Structure formats: structure tokens, C-alpha cells
């Protein structure tokens, strides 16, 4: 949301986000409109907040192209139907005539995914793109996003709790806990040989790995000035409590924020 300038005026945004030599955080709205949805697109995780309930789905999909100056209605209609089919809708005409409240949550999630790809953007930010989908539809979304990432885009940022999706789509992985990066590196290396205690716990909690809980539940007000994972970590020591934990680089190139590697 911050990358595309979609946060409210009261939001606090720090740092910079460079794209083609431009800092997107300081770009005028008129210039951002040329980038948003065309060069950098977002697939949001809450379609009910993104789809207009009083406008037909088909109109909202084609508008993604016309708002950026594409007046070729035939091309817009063709691409709309193409993406609906790719996301598992065998009858695009029925979906085009429907309103969002007439579709299930999973159907709306696939609609919003198609919407984000209508302009064939160079970069895609996919926020929980498989949310609300069953196993069959999740695999279909995997395939579509994988194809798009390999053929139509320069890159894709995937924000997800779905580790299988991350493993299927991402070359590199960042594992976050309470807003802090715990571990970052090549996806295959992290998933096969996790280093940070949180990453290890996350993978051990998967159904195929025993569904082991990640430590004890943390009380809402519980916290410290050090590692945010400290209250749940099985390897916690006093050094974890205070001060910012330094980032360490492992021999395989991974970066881990943990005193065990400092």
C-alpha cells in the first residue's frame, strides 16, 4: 500500500522506495497514477474492500485498462475473458454480468487477481493471493502466477502465510515476525535448512511436519526492546531481551537476525 501511495494521509511512511531512479514515496500523485496499476500492480487480500458492489465485474476489469488510456474495447474485453479463464472461470460471460456480492469470497479473490494483471504490469505485489481458496484452486492460482512471473513481469513480490505458495513462486524469501525481518535468503535454502528459531518453528508447525506449536502464546502487552520473538523462542537468553539484534550473514549468503549467529 505504501509503495503505491494508497495509505491515508495520517499514515507514517519512512525511508525511500526507488523505482527507475524515482523515489515513489515522494512522487506527485499525477505521476504515480501513470505507474499505479500499469507498471506496478497490487493484488489485495480483501476483495470485498476493493471491488465495487454496485458495478458489474466485467466493467471493473476492463476499466483497469481504459483508465490508463487504452481505448481498444475489443482488446480489453478479450484480455478480461482470457484472465478469467486462466483463473478457473469456465463461463466468463456469467462472471462479467455478476456483481461482487453474488460471488463467493474465493471467486472474488480470483477476480481481483485477474484485475491486478489486466495491464500486464512489470511488477506485481500479490498480498495473500490464495486466501479463501480450496486446494484445487490454490494450485491453479500457483500456476497462473508462476507463468506470469516467468513470462510477463520483471518481478513479483508475494506477501503470504502460505509457505507452499512461497516455495512455488519465490526465488528469494524474507521471513518476518511482528514487522521485523528474521531471516532472508534463497527460498530453497531457507525452507530446507532454516536458521532462525522462528523459521524453524514456522516450518515445524506445518501439517506435514507435525503441526508443532511455536512456543507459548504471547500476551498482548508482553514485549521487550530486543528480539520480538524472544518470549516464544526455545533458545532465548538474556542477550535477546535488550537492544536491537544485529543482522548476521551466514556462509551461504543468508542474513539472520539472531544472537546465536552474531
For each feature predicted by the language model, list its residue ranges.
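Conserved ABC transporter NBD signature motif
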Residues: 12-23
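P-loop NTP-binding/switch modules centered on Walker-like glycine-rich loops
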Residues: 133-211
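A short, proline-enriched helix->beta-strand linker immediately N-terminal to the Walker B motif
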Residues: 118-122
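Charged, flexible cofactor/metal-binding loops and thiol motifs
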Residues: 186-262
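Hydrophobic anchor residue at the start of the ABC signature
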Residues: 61, 113, 141
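ABC ATPase NBD coupling module
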Residues: 24-41, 67, 189-194, 223
